[in-house]
C-alpha cells in the first residue's frame, strides 16, 4: 500500500503520519523513517507524539535516515533491509520518489509506504515530486488547516510571508495557512 497525507502548512500531515507510525510500532513492524536532509527544524510535528517518535528513534526501535534523493545505492540499501513499512516526511524535498516506488513495486517487496508533505508551493503550483507519485498512491488523504485570516476550516493553501527566494524554503514562521477565498482574494 502507498498512502499520501497532503495538505497545507499546519493541516496535520506529519501528525497523521506519526499517528500511523506509532500504530506500526505497537504491531512490532520493522520501520524506516525517512526525512529530507534539508529539513533542519529540529522537530517532526508540533504534537506531543513527536517525543514518542524521537524516543523510539533514539532507542533504535525505529531506524531514521536523512536523504537528499533516492539514488540507486539508497534504494538498494532500503530493499536489502526488508522493512515492513516506510514513512517519509516532507517527501517533496526529496528527489526521485517515483523511481523509489516503482523499484519497490517491481521487486514485489510488499513494503507499505506512507508519505506526508505539501503537494503545492506557496504559489499553488504542484511540486514535481507530488505530480510523480500521485498516480502510484493507493490512498490519498487531503487535510485542511484553519485559515489564519478568516478562520475558515478550509485552509488548504500555504501562504508565504514576505519575499520568497526559492520554491522550497524550510521554516514554519515563513508561512501561514489560508483558505482559497483569502489566498485569491483582496487579503493577498
Q: Model regions: which residues?
A:
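Residues immediately C-terminal
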Residues: 93-96
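Short basic/glycine-enriched coil/helix segment immediately N-terminal to the Walker B
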Residues: 75-84
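Walker B catalytic acidic pair
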Residues: 89-91
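Short, cysteine/histidine-rich loop/knuckle motifs that typically chelate Zn2+
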Residues: 149-152, 181
Amino acid at each position: 500500500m502507498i498512502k499520501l497525507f497532503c495538505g497545507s502548512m499546519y493541516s496535520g500531515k506529519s501528525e497523521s503520519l506519526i499517528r500511523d507510525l506509532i500504530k506500526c510500532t505497537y504491531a512490532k513492524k520493522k520501520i524506516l523513517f525517512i526525512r529530507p536532509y534539508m529539513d533542519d527544524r529540529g522537530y517532526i510535528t508540533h504534537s506531543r507524539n513527536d517525543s514518542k517518535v524521537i524516543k523510539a528513534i533514539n532507542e533504535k526501535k525505529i531506524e531514521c535516515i536523512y536523504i537528499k534523493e533516492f539514488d540507486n545505492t539508497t534504494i538498494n540499501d532500503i530493499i536489502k533491509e526488508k522493512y515492513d513499512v516506510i514513512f517519509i516526511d516532507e517527501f517533496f524535498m526529496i528527489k526521485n520518489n517515483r523511481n523509489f516506488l516503482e523499484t519497490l513495486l517491481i521487486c514485489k517487496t510488499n513494503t507499505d509506504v506512507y508519505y506526508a508533505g505539501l503537494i503545492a508551493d506557496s504559489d499553488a503550483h504542484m511540486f514535481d515530486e507530488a505530480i510523480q507519485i500521485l498516480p502510484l498512491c493507493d490512498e490519498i488523504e487531503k487535510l485542511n488547516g484553519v485559515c489564519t485570516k478568516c478562520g475558515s476550516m478550509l485552509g488548504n493553501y500555504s501562504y508565504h510571508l514576505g519575499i520568497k527566494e526559492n520554491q522550497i524554503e524550510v521554516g514554519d514562521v515563513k508561512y501561514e495557512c489560508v483558505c482559497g477565498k483569502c489566498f485569491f482574494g483582496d487579503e493577498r
